[in-house]
Amino acid sequence: MPPQAPPPSQAAVPPPTNPVPQPPPAPAGEAPTTVIEAPAAPSRSASVLRDPLALVLILVTVIALALAGVIGAELIARRIGDSKVAKATECVVNDKASASFGVTPPFLWQHITGNYTNISIHTAGNQVKDAKQMTADLSISDVDLHGTGDSRGTIGSLQATLTWPSAGIKETVQNMVPILGNLVSDLKTNAQDGTVELRGAFGLATVVVKPEVVNGGLSLQVQKLTGLGALTLPRESLQPELDRFASELTKRYPLGLRADSIEVTETGVVARFSTRNASIPRTDDPCFAHL
């Protein structure tokens, strides 16, 4: 039998070109070093939860943000409410107006409950309806908007102070009292006897009237006629015109407002009106459409 060829030898594996460095052997007689791993650091959330100061800061921050949101909502709602009431007033009196709701309780609470404690309104002083240069200051309290039937709610109390300077009275009389309009060139108020003196040109005619409260309305009673006024303006013709004038001024005042007092000052006239437990009617009046 022929001799068998030796099996092919396995291919030699070349040695690694970059051998991995090995740690130096420990010196003789020395125990090998044991590597001790550091414990894992606790998570940040766990450390925060275990820190009382951090918890307090988080709580304070949350409360501050909540308060800021509530205060912001309160200011915005109050501004909207003030604007709506002012716009409605401007529509009624034909003049600019500003309004503000009471500080307490918060406006949002008043709006949610439908009960408003007090509202203040001030007009610019250009006119109140037909009364030129008149200023109105209104104080409204205890408004309940829980309406029933034909009522939108009730107003517990409404007090109005109307301030009318002499120049405005003269202008209004000239526009609204034809029998006097062309004759009145000057007007003077006398606080001592509570009268208003209407003078014609060059003092040739004088009419003295006294404002009074009669049956919840205003009245101008003729006190004296002098000069040409006594000839051209007989009392029996003048008094009905003054009654009509006073009625026109107040007949369109809303919510059953009635005159309480009228005071003649050195600069004009101040009248005070009021109403209590007034029902707010459901109307199609465009002035109140957006309230």
Identify the function of each model-found stretch:
Residues 83-102:
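Short extracytoplasmic/periplasmic juxtamembrane "stem" segments immediately C-terminal to an N-terminal membrane anchor
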Residues 170-239:
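Soluble extracytoplasmic domains of inner/organellar membrane proteins
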Residues 4, 96-170, 174-183, 191-196:
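N-terminal beta-strand/beta-hairpin edge segment
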Residues 54-75, 99, 271:
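Hydrophobic alpha-helical membrane segments, chiefly transmembrane helices and signal peptide h-regions
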Residues 1-59, 63:
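Terminal targeting segments of Actinobacterial cell-envelope proteins
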